[in-house]
Amino acid sequence: MENVIFVDKALYFIQKARVQCQNRKTHLEKNNKQDPLVEDVLEKLMDLEKYLNKKVEEIVKQHPAYDWFSNIRGIGNLNIGKVFCLIDIEKATTISKLWRYALGAPINGKVEKREKGKPIHYNAMLKTMCWRLAKSLIRANGKYATYYREQKKRITEKMEQAGYTIISGSEKGKEKVISKGHIDRMAMRKMLKLFLSHLWLKWREALGLPITKPYVHEIGGHTSYITPEEMMEAKRTKKNQ
């Protein structure tokens, strides 16, 4: 897992340097100039970037749950690597423990947030990586994105039935008012909890660790089980890796 962190950090700096070189090359070209050194450095940076991307792919393919998450639309080698490298699956003995560590847990009815002088019970970096992954899942428009849209619709209807006014702006300081952004984040969190429960299940299952039942959710008053396999789609191609 440490290798993923090392390669990811190296890749970040190489990509940053490559972009700077490309910008320099573009600037020179606009002024009808060339700099052999810039072009040579750019070529070497691009080669190193390709090498590091290949290394990330090799590391991710060794993950116990790879056969499952490699078939999830929206999951790429980098975004999933940044998530699982921060998780100690042996310590996460239950799904709820993983949820709390990755996303924070409700305290007095509100999601835990960082407050000055107070300890937090989640990994801030992991939480950030999870939210980035959530956006990737939604953009990919796969089965997790479908679940997200279903949850967004359900939450919206529930709020309307409870007498809430849904607005586009800030809801701060207003009673019986909730913003569209708040509902969106609630739906994304639901989707992330489902994904993390599936990752937890397939990962621990592959390692022979004790597991519990899959994540349960309520739809129309009926209890349904969504299995990790139900969310799998066609094998990814190199294009969407």
Label each region the model flagged.
Residues 232-241:
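Acidic, low-complexity intrinsically disordered tails
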Residues 169, 179-216, 220-231:
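Basic, amphipathic alpha-helical segments enriched in Lys/Arg and hydrophobic/aromatic residues
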Residues 3-6, 10, 37, 180, ...:
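Non-transmembrane, amphipathic alpha-helical segments
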Residues 1-30:
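Phosphate- and other anionic-substrate recognition elements at nucleic-acid/protein interfaces
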Residues 22-78:
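Helix-hairpin-helix/helix-loop-helix acidic hairpins
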Residues 68, 83-185, 189:
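Phosphate-backbone recognition surface of nucleic-acid-processing proteins
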Residues 9, 16, 75-78, 93, ...:
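Generic recognition of stable, solvent-exposed alpha-helical segments in well-folded globular domains
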Residues 80, 127, 131, 135, ...:
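Amphipathic alpha-helical core segments of compact helical bundles
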